[in-house]
């Protein structure tokens, strides 16, 4: 599911027959859909006043080291794949975030956040989903990515709910 589809889901939950659902429930449903589609962004509360609550698209997960160690062949391979589409350098990497890690299979759903002056976001970052699944039987790691269409994040989505 793309971020736009996640937002459409949120809009449907809010405006079509879910009058008894709170805005928090709608956000939770949208975030579940975003995470299930390995989106690099979720909707997070960024401000709250006595009158309103603001949610914006923010990188998913918690700041955490990647399972691809710095300087390893795996991190080199990840950057090769990202650079087939985009031109981010290792020095552009702001942080890695762990969304999910499976202890049994070592599958990881990570979000790599890059400083990006061409990002449409106010914070000038672009987040990319990096999915890594070790394949010990053949001695490698399967990789998959969720990269913005033009490599740079669009303006962040913002929702403001009145109290």
Language model features: what each stretch is:
Residues 21-163:
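Cysteine-centric segments in proteins
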Residues 16-17:
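C-terminal motif of bacterial Sec signal peptides marking the signal peptidase cleavage site
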Residues 12-13:
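Short, linear, compositionally biased motifs with a strong N-terminal bias
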Residues 1-7:
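Bacterial N-terminal signal peptides that target proteins for export
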């Amino acid at each position: 599911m793309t971020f736009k589809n996640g937002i459409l889901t949120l809009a449907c939950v809010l405006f079509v027959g879910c009058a008894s659902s709170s805005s928090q429930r709608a956000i939770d449903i949208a975030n579940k859909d975003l995470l299930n589609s390995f989106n690099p962004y979720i909707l997070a509360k960024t401000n709250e006043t006595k009158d309103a609550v603001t949610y914006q698209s923010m990188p998913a997960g918690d700041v955490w080291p990647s399972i691809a160690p710095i300087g390893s062949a795996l991190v080199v391979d990840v950057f090769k794949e990202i650079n087939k589409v985009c031109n981010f350098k290792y020095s552009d990497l702001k942080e890695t975030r762990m969304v999910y890690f499976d202890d049994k299979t070592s599958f990881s759903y990570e979000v790599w956040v890059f400083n990006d002056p061409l990002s449409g976001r106010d914070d000038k970052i672009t987040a990319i989903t990096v999915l890594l699944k070790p394949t010990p039987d053949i001695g490698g790691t399967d990789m998959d990515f969720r990269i913005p269409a033009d490599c740079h994040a669009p303006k962040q989505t913002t929702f403001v709910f009145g109290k």
